[in-house]
Amino acid sequence: MNSASDTHFSLFGLPEHFEVDDGALNAAYRTVQSRAHPDRHAHASDAERRVAMQWATRANEAYQTLRDPLKRATYLLHLRGVDVQAENNTAMPPAFLMQQLEWRESLADAKAAGDLDALDDLLAMLRGEKRARYQTLAGLLNGGGHDAAAADAVRQLMFIEKIERDTAEAIDRLDD
């Protein structure tokens, strides 16, 4: 198995890019897990079982990070020494803040009216916005030299994903 200093990407033999081949990631994860799975080391020494458990845990964490685009982008920036500062840097461009307010108002109005069509429309629009922003983020991350802009894009995507979840939950509640 690889050394503890390897990246999540190298653990699975993948290039350090924002775009990840899901099939290759899944196959590599299964391979690493099969080698590190604690059941495979049931008759090993305590130390060997502990190491196997650590590798299985590391593989799970790496897999969860790489399969989620937002976590993957944050991780790539971390590898480059850039802290996204999601907790303490909530500064956003005024246009994005206005858009966010409009989305929140649309969500509140649709929920209050019980308007499933409006919620569906908002969810579709948010998903389209998210797709477009992920494409932009990929260009920033893969183009090099745009790490600060990529960190800003990650923070904006966090807001978009939050309102997307809130909208999907509102739809689920109305469907019940």
Swiss-Prot record:
One Gene Ontology molecular-function label: ATPase activator activity
Chain segments annotated as coiled-coil in the UniProt record: none
Cross-referenced CDD domains: DnaJ
One Pfam family named in its UniProt record: HSCB_C
Keywords, alphabetical: Chaperone
Keyword Chaperone listed: yes
One GO cellular component, as annotated: iron-sulfur cluster transfer complex
An individual GO BP term: [2Fe-2S] cluster assembly
Function description: Co-chaperone involved in the maturation of iron-sulfur cluster-containing proteins. Seems to help targeting proteins to be folded toward HscA.
Similarity remark: Belongs to the HscB family.
Protein name as it appears in the record: Co-chaperone protein HscB homolog
Species this protein is from: Ralstonia nicotianae (strain ATCC BAA-1114 / GMI1000) (Ralstonia solanacearum)
